[in-house]
Structure formats: structure tokens, C-alpha cells
Amino acid sequence: MSRELPSSFDGKSEFDEDEMDILEKMAFKCKQQPLVPLGVIATTGAIFLATKSIRKGDRVNTQKYFRYRVGFQLATLIALVAGGYMFQVESDEQKATREEILRAKAKVRERLWIEELERKDEAMKSRKKRLEDSRAELIQAAKEGFEEEKKWTDAIENAKEEESAEGNDNKDVSN
């Protein structure tokens, strides 16, 4: 059978954060709180512009970009806290949903596992039956062969006895 056995590692659920790799997890978190990545990008841009103005020697713009950086970091922090507060209620609902999904997934895996065991059991029973049938056929063929061989050996022995009896009769007649 080339069919694969069910496994506890089959498939990935959207809510299964433990089974996600780092990029999938980042994308999932960005979808949950979309303002945080925007704040991070804005902060990074402000730092980049501040670095550029430092190289030019422009102190006024450097101070302005560093102030923007602080403002963007504050906005990111506020978005993070507000998003955490807003998603806390949703998180509890997600936990309940995740538990239900995991229970359903476990039931499906158990059902698939039981079906696979039943298939294997049926295959084993059919192999056993074929083996018993072929063994019975082999025994029957052997019996028939032995009976046929016995007939031939009996016929040969009878022919030898008849020859020896005829030979003895000829010796008696000649004496």
C-alpha cells in the first residue's frame, strides 16, 4: 500500500502559531495589529533620514528626524498597547475557537487512524485467508499426486509380480 498513514503533524491551521515558521508568524501578527508594522517602518525611516542628515552635517534636520523617531516610537507603542487591549477579548474567543479546532482535528485524526487500522486488519485477514486457501489447495494437490503415484507404483509392482509369476510358471513347465 502506497497510502501514507495519518500523522499528528498533518497540515497547518491558521491559528496554530506553534507550527508556523517565523515569516508566517510575522505575517499573522501583522494582520492582527496592522498599525504596529506601520509604526516600525515610520520609525526606521526617521532613523534613516536622521543618519543621512548627520552625514550632511545638517543639525536642524537631524534634530527634527530624531524627534519624529521618538513620536513614531510613541505612536507604535500606543498602537501596540491599544491593539493588545482590543485583541485581548478577541484572544479569549480565539483560544476557545482554537481549542474547538484542536478537538475536531484530534477526532478526525483518531477516525483516520482507526480507519487505517481497520484497513490493515482487513488486508491481514484477506492475506491469511488466501494463505489458508492456497495451503488447502497444495495439500489437495499433494494428496492427488500421492494417490496417482501410488497407483503407478502399485501397477508397476503388479506388473513385476506378474512377470515373476510368469517366469516361475515357465521354469516349472520346462522342468
From Swiss-Prot:
GO cellular component terms attached to this protein's record: mitochondrial inner membrane; respiratory chain complex
Stretches for region Disordered: 147-175
Domain HIG1: 7-98
Pfam families for this protein: HIG_1_N
Coiled coil: 90-144
UniProt keywords, alphabetically: Coiled coil, Membrane, Mitochondrion, Transmembrane, Transmembrane helix
Transmembrane residue ranges: 34-54, 70-90
InterPro entries found in the cross-reference section: Hypoxia_induced_domain, RCF1
GO BP of this protein: mitochondrial cytochrome c oxidase assembly; mitochondrial respirasome assembly; regulation of proton transport
Cell compartments where the protein resides: Mitochondrion membrane
PROSITE patterns: HIG1 (PS51503)
Membrane topology, as annotated: Multi-pass membrane protein
Subunit structure: Associates with the respiratory chain complex III/complex IV supercomplex.
Family the entry assigns: Belongs to the RCF1 family.
Role description: Cytochrome c oxidase subunit which plays a role in assembly of respiratory supercomplexes.
Descriptive protein name: Respiratory supercomplex factor 1, mitochondrial
